[in-house]
Amino acid sequence: MNDSEFHRLADGLWMTIEERLDAWDGDSDIDCEINGGVLTLSFENGSKIIINRQEPLHQVWLATKQGGYHFDYKNDEWICDRSGERFWDLLETAATQQAGEAVSFR
């Protein structure tokens, strides 16, 4: 993967997260802010989820209260380089725990 392909994929990921949160009708207030290559989800309880790009590695990193995860793009999806879990699964689990109600990005 080259840098422009990585940026296209990461931009698509950011856009999908933002669109899904805009369409989400849960009781919790989840704010989404994008600043440069960093996307921050802020929850009512003050906790945050940080998603950022690691361009030199062509990875997306996810930081949650439960821990940090690094994702490589494989077979058309972002996969954790340690556990093999999918990005969307880990993001939904973390967002659900931090929001105190079920959150879906799919």
Swiss-Prot record:
Pfam families: Frataxin_Cyay (PF01491)
Keywords: Iron, Metal-binding
Family annotation (PROSITE patterns): FRATAXIN_1, FRATAXIN_2
Transferase recorded as keyword: no
Role this protein plays: Involved in iron-sulfur (Fe-S) cluster assembly. May act as a regulator of Fe-S biogenesis.
HAMAP family: CyaY
The protein's name: Iron-sulfur cluster assembly protein CyaY
Organism name: Cronobacter sakazakii (strain ATCC BAA-894)
Name of the gene this protein is made from: cyaY
